Structures are given as structure tokens and as C-alpha cells.
Amino acid sequence: MKEAETARPVFGRRDPDARGYFGAYGGRFVPETLVAPIEELTAGYYAARKDEAFCEELDRLLKHYVGRPTPLYEARNLAGAGKAGRAGEAGRVGGVRSDPAGVRVFLKREDLTHTGAHKINNALGQALLARRMGKRRVVAETGAGQHGVATATACALLGLECRVYMGTEDMRRQALNVVRMHLLGATVHGVDAGSRTLKDAINEAMRDWVANVTDTYYLLGSALGPHPYPLMVREFQSVIGREARAQILEQAGRLPDLVVACVGGGSNAIGIFDGFLDDKAVRLIGVEAGGEKIAPGRHAARFAGGSTGVLQGTRTFVLQDEAGNIELTHSISAGLDYAAVGPEHAWLRDLGRTEYAHISDAEALDGFKALARLEGILPALESSHAIAYTMQLIPTLKPGSIVLVNLSGRGDKDVQTVIDSGGRVLSDPADRR
């Protein structure tokens, strides 16, 4: 695989319509005060992606700063445990080796990027855009903290002032990332409104942007919000799918049968899906947060319990009551704990091109444990949803099937949450026989 062919985005392949819609979803639902800044951003982005110097700098930084391309790793032990139907019992001495004729599982290792997650791909691209547009100050929201860390990292590199908004509940469960942001020079502002999670952080970041539009750039972290954000984020994240497609052809000799990724706003998923959208035989499966159960306020599975609505600038699938009030959400994973999904995901689902499932908190913890004890990899709790779903899926697949999973981030940030979950993950499997 030639690195020069995979690091830089291929812009302009799947643009929304002139109003920013993917089918019935997307658009721009913003107050009058944001119309001019959004138009400035749109013009700035379309100009930047045609600028060879901008593209070359992004390409160079993705390779030599972020560490792209990230590896594609075959998880043989995980595949064997999934075949045996033992996700909840993973970790017994000696591991489980897969049958060579059985299902093969490959992990796209976004956890190995600089900062430890896929978020840096988008943060770096948008930070370069902010500098190109003459903005000296960047504001961002964060849930799991990885986007905040990535934004603070990019701003430190490019000499930009950085302010990150984060719900106080997320600050509690992602305390390590709060410290990392401070160390990188960012100001972290706790948001104590509403559910004190990602939705509320986005509200505050957008208020800041409205009040400081002249010198401030809003660096949105997922494939949602008003146009052009869903397009920009997908294009900056499309490097994942483009690399993964070339790597799986090289290692396995053919395309995968399934591509699986967790879905909060949906940036890591849309990034890897983008490399396979034209390959109709490849199933694309997004995994949402099933939380405690599918009931109002107990989960964040928009396609399981949501309906079409508008939230924070975009029309998409939203968790809301009959009156259109946004429902509270819950997930053990801060990065999936959000009431809406990116509009392109909603459109692709309507087209029948993508499928969506959900995994509970308990199942995600089992996925976390399985990957740690079978492969020696600590996944983010977000990614653990995709791992857990894959292990449930393996026994249903034909021998020789290939599953590609996007391992969107590493789990260092989630250790305290895992500790707080009690003995489910930390106890020795032998003690529970």
C-alpha cells in the first residue's frame, strides 16, 4: 500500500445538495446570528479543499504527526472466542485460537493514532482550516474527551487559542482527558446545565461562537450539526475507510463481508463506511448505545427509539417525546451519550445501505474485557460496543466470512468507569465459574 495514496482526503465525491441535505436529512437550522458565519465557513471550506498547499500540509501532518496509515490487525483470538459464543467468559488462561477456516476479524487500529482516537483526523483538518480563515481562537465541545484532547493538540501545534466545553458529568467520568486538555494549554469550561453531557456542551460551544464570530472558529467533533459540518467531518475522517480498504485487500485478498463501527454522532463510522459505500456486497453496520434498556432516558439508540426531528442545527433521527422535547440519554460510554445521529447515517439507513444495532452497557463491558484479555488491547468503551456486537455476530456467519471492525479509540480514559462498574470486568474469570 502506498502511503501517498491514502493519507490525504479525496474531496468532493459525495457532497450533499446545495442546501446541505442528504436526502431528507441535514440542512441548516441556525439562528440568524449564525447564518453569516456558517456561509463564511462553507466558502472557506470549499476553497481550502481545492487548495493544493492546504491538502499537502494536511497530508504531511497526517503521516508524520498523526502516524497514518494506522495498522490493520487480525484479531485471531477474538474471532475464536466469538465463534465459541464466549464474549462474557473471555480471558481464561491460554486464550482461544480461531479455526483457519472460520470467521476472520480485522481491527482498524485508530487507537494507535497520536492522541489515541480517530478524532485527531478531523480536529487537525479543521484547525488548519481555522488558521487559513484567519481565526485565532477555537472553541469545541467534547463528550468522551477525545475530541477535546485532539482539538487542544491541534491548537497547540498551530498556535491557536483553545476553549473546550464539556458537561460536568462527562468531566467526572473522563477526568484523565480533562487533565490532558489542561496540559495541552486548553481552557476547559464545565457545563452544568441539562444532563451535563455532550448535548449541553454543544449548546454552550455554539453560544460562545455566536458571541465571538469575528475571531472564533467552532470545531465540531462529529458528523452532525448544520451544513457544512457533516460533510467536512466525513471527508476528514474518510482516510480511515480508504486505508482500511487497501489494507484488507492486501492482507485478506478480498473485501470484507461486514464493516462494523460504533455510532454516537457517527464520525468514526461514516469515515470507515465511506471506503466501502460503492461495494454493495459489503454490509455496513453501525452499533449504537443501548444503555440500560430501550426506554426513555435509559439509552442513546436513536434508530431504536427515535424519530425524525431537528437538533442543534440539523434534521435527523432524534430521541424525543411526542411533543418534540429532547429526551435525556444514557450510556456508559460518554462518546455515545447523545440524542441525535449524523444526518448522513439517517439517509444511508433510509436507502437501505447501512444497518444499525445496539449494545447494552453490560454487553459493552464484556466487549471491553474480551479484547483486553484475548488480544492485549484496551479499547475505548465506545469501540467496545462494536467489539461486543461483532462477537455476538460471529456465530451467525458462514465459515470464511471476514469482519472489519473500526477500533475507534483506546480505553485508558475509561479505566475509572470500568472500576466504578464493579466486579463485572475486574474480577478474575476463574472466580466466577
Tell where the protein language model's regions lie, with residue ranges.
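Positively charged, low-complexity intrinsically disordered leader regions
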Residues: 3-26, 32-135
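Buried hydrophobic positions in well-ordered alpha/beta secondary-structure cores of metabolic enzymes
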Residues: 27, 71, 107, 119, ...
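Alpha-helix C-terminal capping segments
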Residues: 81, 125-135, 149-161, 183, ...
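A short, small-residue-rich loop immediately preceding and capping a beta-strand
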Residues: 114, 122, 130-167, 255-268, ...
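Active-site-proximal loop->helix
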Residues: 139, 147-205, 294-306, 414-421
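Glycine-rich ThDP/TPP pyrophosphate-binding loop and its adjacent helix/strand module
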Residues: 199-208, 215, 220, 224-282
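Active-site/ligand-binding loops adjacent to catalytic centers
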Residues: 202-228, 232, 281, 286-377, ...
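Claisen-condensing/thiolase-fold acyl-transfer catalytic domains that form or cleave C-C bonds
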Residues: 263, 267, 361-422
